[in-house]
Amino acid sequence: MQTIALVDDDRNILTSVSIALEAEGYKVETYTDGASALEGLLARPPHLAIFDIKMPRMDGMELLRRLRQKSDLPVIFLTSKDEEIDELFGLKMGADDFITKPFSQRLLVERVKAILRRAPARDAAAAGVAGAAKSADAPSRSLERGQLVMDQERHTCTWKSEPVTLTVTEFLILHSLAQRPGVVKSRDALMDAAYDEQVYVDDRTIDSHIKRLRKKFKMVDVDFDMIETLYGVGYRFRESA
């Protein structure tokens, strides 16, 4: 059974969303503030987390920032219509998706399913998933482009043999670019590679993910410049690495 962590100080949302997710067969763990959520998420990593932004003790943005220092756990944010700036900041911090309040329970469930379909099988020790140890021994599907190595089965990425931790969305965007070096991928093409059809994202979402990818690789190699921007067209991965 897959576990979803739900973090919100609104108990009505906790109750209604929990019911909707449990009806789909998920186990739900709830938290009412960011501080207790951080402790629980690190001690008992779920398969996916859903955060509100405005919460006591620690808001959702700070929770995500601290979580990203130790985990690439998929995260969906719940936002209000007037929190566009927060949404852009959250994408830069590594959020996988946003849902604007008020929202339908069906929409949220579909977003959860979409991200979990894209996410790799999580380690048994991290998520308590039966059979995960078996998948860890399965043959890997790796993509090698010069100094870049991406393993889809294990959701690992290295540059010059140094590990680079990526979220599910970042991994899929980079994998799409690296599959065909030198070929320009439009933002629409990258959206199709990283998101299910029912999930709407705009150009700024892809741009934010690209910025974060570059930042992560530059932390490993300050000279990293393999992702090129072709203004008005899209992005491409350089042919030589």
UniProtKB/Swiss-Prot annotation:
Compartmental location: Cytoplasm
Biological or metabolic pathway of the protein: Glycan metabolism; exopolysaccharide biosynthesis
DNA-binding positions: 140-239
Binding site for Mg(2+): D8, D9, D52
SUPFAM superfamilies per record: C-terminal effector domain of the bipartite response regulators (SSF46894), CheY-like (SSF52172)
Cofactor(s) required for function per UniProt: Mg(2+)
Cofactor note: Binds 1 Mg(2+) ion per subunit.
The species this protein was found in: Sinorhizobium fredii (strain NBRC 101917 / NGR234)
Post-translational modification: Phosphorylated by ChvG.
Gene Ontology terms: cellular component: cytosol; protein-DNA complex
Response regulatory domain mapped to chain residues: 3-116
Encoding gene per record: chvI
Protein name, per record: Transcriptional regulatory protein ChvI
GO biological process: polysaccharide biosynthetic process; regulation of DNA-templated transcription
